[in-house]
């Protein structure tokens, strides 16, 4: 048993997400949920996001891991300096050459 303030950054992130999920909200807003987490925990976070989605709950996700975010997204928006430059389904954006080149490491 530890106080939240004594946990590592990744542990604090997991605690915050866990506390949010305990409330069983209809809308879950997550800002960079994978930030500072080990790859295994990132997988777990996105599994939980998938479960939440299957329960027909709404998630507003801000995430720099574009591939993971778009894989679970019904709808995606790509912003550059605060302006929406691309929008579409997660699947459409994953297939977009512009998104692949700019955010997924593909060569244009």
List each language-model region with its residue ranges.
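Glycine-rich phosphate-binding loops of nucleotide-dependent enzymes
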Residues: 1-108
């Amino acid at each position: 048993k530890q106080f939240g303030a004594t946990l590592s950054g990744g542990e604090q992130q997991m605690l915050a997400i866990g506390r949010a999920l305990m409330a069983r909200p209809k809308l879950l807003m997550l800002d960079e949920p994978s930030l500072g987490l080990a790859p295994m925990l990132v997988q777990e976070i996105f599994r939980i996001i998938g479960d939440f989605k299957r329960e027909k709950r709404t998630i507003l996700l801000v995430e720099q891991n574009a591939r993971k975010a778009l894989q679970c997204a019904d709808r995606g928006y790509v912003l550059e300096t605060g302006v929406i430059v691309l929008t579409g389904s997660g699947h459409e954006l994953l297939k977009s050459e512009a998104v692949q080149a700019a955010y997924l490491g593909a060569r244009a």
